[in-house]
């Protein structure tokens, strides 16, 4: 459903041209983490996605600040018990659903614990 905003639809032909600049990776920490995970491979991308889901959920529930999302995601990517799962070279192997769900469950548990620690004033 779309809300009527009174604004005309975007017409790219009428706009003419767009200019894209390199993103500031210090300001956009989650983009930096996504690029890092992409370099590491499939398992790291699964870990990043799961940690992000949990962190965003906590933010929307007002349990953490917006800037804590990147902190939680990075802490999960740096966590040794998660890293051992994604540090394996999967190469071109397509991960099965069972393997993905196992990783997802593990990251959810760790991300939730890290959020709890952060809320208690702990350092990640």
Task: State each model region's role.
Residues 1-124:
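Catalytic, metal-anchored helix/loop core of enzyme active sites in primary metabolism
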